[in-house]
Amino acid sequence: MKAAVIGLGSMGYGIAQSVLRADHQTWGVDINADAVARFVAEGGQAGDLPSDLNAVAVVVLNAAQTESVLFGPQGIVPKLPKGAVVLACATVPPDFARDMEARCASHGVHYLDAPISGGAAKAAQGALSVMASGTAEAFAAAKPMLDAMATTVFSLGDGAGAGSAMKAVNQLLAGVHIATMAEALTFGMTQGVAPEKFLEVISECAGSSWMLENRAPHIVAGVYT
């Protein structure tokens, strides 16, 4: 398979590494030249995408960036061969995902609504969770890339939108967990509980959560990058 990952940030870089590790020819694209150079040094490809590309994961920030990558002045969809698939991994509104699916279909390109979860470490391990929805053809075309980047792929429907709806549910809970964790940490500090001890104890108790275990160490260390 010939694949590309557009967006080599904390999540996209790990996805690109995982796809490359699965012995697929993999192109990395990013406005950050250092990220691209690092990927090339690890065996990846850069430069113009091949005309016979099979799959593209778009791992950017939001709907506006996704649309720009797909249909902007340098948009990739009109250049993709018929039967190729776009895996759209950003968190976007469900209606936007449905619109992108229809626009891709008009070019003979499959669109898989494929928001991701798991964090940078799991992206690098090829162990993400993907909340996916799309046609059977989109799933089939995306399978080699999904197999490389994820250990859990939820099939949530036969059209785009359902995956993004589920991601919105996940993000609501994630936001609540982060806010509650911050309030709990602050409360503990007012009671004389050291932040380091808060993290040590609560991580092993019923009040823990994935977001606490993933984000609280950064907060306690004062590292917000």
Predicted regions and their residues:
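NAD(P)+-binding Rossmann beta1-loop-alpha1 motif at the extreme N-terminus of oxidoreductases
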Residues: M1-V58, A84
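Hydrophobic beta-strand scaffold residues
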Residues: T26, A46, H110-L112, V153, ...
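Rossmann-fold NAD(P) dinucleotide-binding segment
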Residues: L49-Y111
